[in-house]
C-alpha cells in the first residue's frame, strides 16, 4: 500500500541527508530491481492524491510483479493519499477491502 519500491529517487531528495544512501545501497534496497520468481497473488494499491513519483513506482512495481505472477491487482484509490489508502482497507465497500479478503480466502 503506497510503497516505496525504488529508492534511487531518494538520492536526489533532502531526505537522503539523514538516510545517506549511496547508489548501490539504494538499488539493493529497491524491491523493484529484485528478481522475483514466486508466482503468488499480489495487491498494489495507491492513492491518486499521492505525488506522481509514488504513483509511478506503484504502477511500475505492479508491472514487474505481472511478469512474475499472473495474479497481480493494481488498485488506484480516488481522493486518497497514503494515510487514507491504508484506511480504505477497512472500508467494506472498497475494492481494496474486497480484494484483500479474496486474497486471504475470506470470501
Model regions: which residues?
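The feature captures the conserved acid-bearing segment of alpha/beta-hydrolase catalytic domains
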Residues: 2-64
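C-terminal catalytic histidine-bearing segment of alpha/beta-hydrolase fold enzymes
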Residues: 43-45, 55-62, 66-107
